Every structure is written in C-alpha cells, then in structure tokens.
A protein has these predicted regions:
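Conserved beta-strand-loop-alpha-helix junction that forms the acyl-donor binding cleft
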Residues: 99-104, 130-140
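Conserved catalytic-core motifs of GNAT/GCN5-like acyltransferases
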Residues: 129-131, 145-161
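Conserved GNAT acetyl-CoA-binding A-motif
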Residues: 91-92, 120-134
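Conserved structured core elements
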Residues: 16-23, 106-111, 138, 152
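A conserved beta-strand-loop-helix scaffold within acyl/acetyltransferase catalytic domains
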Residues: 1-98
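Conserved acetyl-CoA-binding loop-helix of GNAT-fold acetyltransferases
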Residues: 91-99, 104-120, 146
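Short conserved micro-motifs at the rims of enzyme active sites and ligand-binding pockets
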Residues: 65-67, 104-107, 141
Length: 162
C-alpha cells in the first residue's frame, strides 16, 4: 500500500492511507480477493522491488440488482457468493492500479494488463469496468487508447456556499 500512497499523492484531494486504514483494507478486501485477479510488477534490477500493482474483483453490480429489495437474507447472499467464489458475472471491476512515478511510461501498465487480461479470458469475463478516474489525469486516460474502450459514465461534484 506504500505504492498507493506514492502513486496517488499528487491527485486532487487524495489523503495518504494510515497504517490502520491499510490493515482494514487488507482484512476486508485482500483476504477475500481471488489472487489470480491481483497482479504485481517487480524490478529484478532493483532487488525484486514491487513497482506496480493491479487489483480487480468480479463485479457485484448485477448480483445486487438481481436481489432487488436489497435484502441479503434469506437467499440474496447466494447471488453475491456466486460472484465472489465462482465469478458468475461477465464483468470485472478494475479497483486499483498503481505504478511508482519513476516506472511510468516504461511498460509497467502493459505488464499489468497482459497478466490480468489473460485471467479475465480464463474466467470468461466479457467486460471490464474502471473505477472513477479524473478526466484531467492524462496519464491514466492515455492508457485506454490501446484498448477498445468507451467512456459511458461521468461523475461530477459541485460546491455551493450556503
């Protein structure tokens, strides 16, 4: 998670993760993750230092829509479990991708996607959904030019003094 802090530190409104937050994320998400959908890039010339990572999860969106009333019990939890354990969805969510600044524009993203896309095909995912990204972050926006991609959602925040 040190890579997360280093990678995102210059993004608008990003707050460094504390040790407590890191522990919480590891216990809540990483322990439940399918490690085939998590990848890392190491620099063998720098003592196998981790320089980039990618974390993805099967999308729970369709399962939660199917539940409809929002109740996990008595049977809603089974739909969520099918996604978590058996990947019964056609969409994967790209949760986090991070590359240390000194390794950007050197192919680290390509290595991340080369590994992850192979796993996505193996699991039968047809779509990948990226989490919100700043439109002004040209570094992250430019990576999509090499893939068949479509921006179909925009998030906006507005301020108004009351």
């Amino acid at each position: 998670f040190e890579i997360v802090n280093e990678t995102y530190k210059n993004l608008y409104d990003f707050q460094q993760l504390t040790e407590k937050q890191i522990d919480e994320y590891v216990n809540t998400y990483i322990k439940k993750a399918d490690l085939n959908l998590v990848t890392g890039v190491v620099d063998g010339n720098a003592g196998n230092k981790l320089v980039a990572f990618g974390v993805s999860f099967p999308s729970f969106t369709d399962a939660l829509r199917e539940i409809g009333d929002g109740k996990l019990f008595p049977t809603g939890w089974l739909k969520v479990l099918k996604v978590l354990k058996w990947h019964k969805t056609d969409t994967v969510d790209l949760l986090l991708i991070g590359v240390l600044p000194e390794y950007r524009k050197k192919g680290a993203n390509a290595l991340i996607f080369a590994d992850l896309i192979e796993q996505y095909h193996r699991y039968g995912f047809k779509w990948a959904e990226a989490m919100p990204q700043m439109e002004t972050n040209t570094g992250v926006q430019s990576q999509w030019q090499y893939l068949e991609s479509e921006q179909h959602r925009r998030h906006r925040c507005y301020k108004k003094k009351i």
